[in-house]
From Swiss-Prot:
Lineage of the species this protein comes from: Eukaryota, Metazoa, Ecdysozoa, Arthropoda, Hexapoda
Post-translational modification as stated in the protein's UniProt record: (Microbial infection) Targeted and hydrolyzed by the light chain (LC) of P.bifermentans PMP1. Cleavage probably inhibits neurotransmitter release.
Gene (name only): Syx1A
InterPro entries in alphabetical order: SNARE, Syntaxin, Syntaxin/epimorphin_CS, Syntaxin_N, T_SNARE_dom
Origin species: Anopheles gambiae
Name this polypeptide is given: Syntaxin-1A
Annotated positions for site (Microbial infection) Cleavage: 240-241
Amino acid sequence: MTKDRLAALQAAQSDDEDMPEDVAVPVEGSFMEDFFKEVEEIRMMIDKIQANVEEVKKKHSAILSAPQSDEKTKQELEDLMADIKKTANRVRGKLKGIEQNIEQEEQQSKSNADLRIRKTQHSALSRKFVEVMTEYNRTQTDYRERCKGRIQRQLEITGRATTNEELEEMLEQGNSAVFTQGIIMETQQAKQTLADIEARHADIIKLENSIRELHDMFMDMAMLVESQGEMIDRIEYHVEHAMDYVQTATQDTKKALKYQSKARRKKIWIAICVLIAIIILVVFLAIYLT
């Protein structure tokens, strides 16, 4: 392999001497350099989504803890959600592109170290992406439940208690009037309660639209990661067993060295005993013959 690379470099150098100076010569490995740049770009986008998800959580808490609807905070929340959606679609597109390139090379029966590296990187990025989007989905679902709880408490204040099932039925109708009918708005508090109920209902509608928009993308990536799971598990299995084999081999080597050392010492002791026996025999014969 080293000789082949050396020959290729020498050939490239020879060709370069015959070329004009302004002609660019492709450098071996430039494809993988571009790939790793793309990997880093995808990783940074996923990190950006993760950071935005944390900001979304803060906005949710700020909105729910505010006594009155804060339009500025709501707009900031919508901007964050729009940015997450935009970035997530870009990540999905890039991961899909890498996946298609890998599949094309596999169909051409290409198998090399670079391909395995790309598959491993693609799998790691896909898993990370799904983890981040799962957290985002969980954040949205949690916010929806908290908005429901807020509506339920406000309805109780107005004297209209509702069960969770009844509240879900009202939400499915998509009309805030079903929540506010029968509420007498004679006081400022009643008006504020009505406004809060309508605001929370509007938040839930936006959340449900956002969840639906991201659902297909989320399921697509989740299925991809699941299909990669068996391959990754097999790789981890073989790596673990390889490590076990190395550890076992190391222990066996230590045992062999230990046994070899014992055997060597035993041979030395036997030689010493034989030598002593010979000396005793010589002395005995010398005395006897004398």
